[in-house]
Amino acid sequence: MQNNQTVQKTQWSQFGTLIIVFFFWGFVAASNDILIPFFKENLHLSQAYSQLVSFAFYTAYTVGSIIFMIISETRKRDLLQDMGYKNGISVGLIISALGTLLFFPAAQTSSFFLFISGLFIVGLGFALQQIAANPLAVILGDPKTG
């Protein structure tokens, strides 16, 4: 009996890059907790307000996912099918980078609102990156083990 199925080899160079990106998402997400005592002390915030750091960042994941779903439903087609997974990750990285740019005026003006807005935008970018990266990770490997 002959096996006519072809085996897809894992594309390790692309997969390695994706692993590094996943590491940095985790690193940034874990680093948000470091900002809480810093903001609390330097911006004279209550404990409740300082916890908005985590709230804004993780709420952005939910909001970003809902926005992505609404766009895909409105178009009657998955946005990533047209954009591509790699481009989706790239656009997400650009959105996240734009969010980090808000930290400059936020630091100059000691504006907690700008800091939180920047973190929210970073979270929106991360949402798009992860929506694109998870199926890409499966596609890069053997579908049998995906």
What are these model-predicted stretches?
Residues 51-78:
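Central cavity-lining transmembrane alpha-helices of secondary-active solute carriers
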Residues 23, 99, 111-129:
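Hydrophobic core of transmembrane alpha-helices in multi-pass small-molecule transporters
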Residues 128-142:
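Intracellular juxtamembrane helix-capping segments at the cytosolic ends
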Residues 82-89, 115:
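Primarily marks hydrophobic transmembrane alpha-helices of the MFS/SLC 12-helix fold
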Residues 13-45, 65-68:
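Extracytoplasmic
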Residues 26, 90-109:
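C-terminal ends and interior cores of transmembrane alpha-helices
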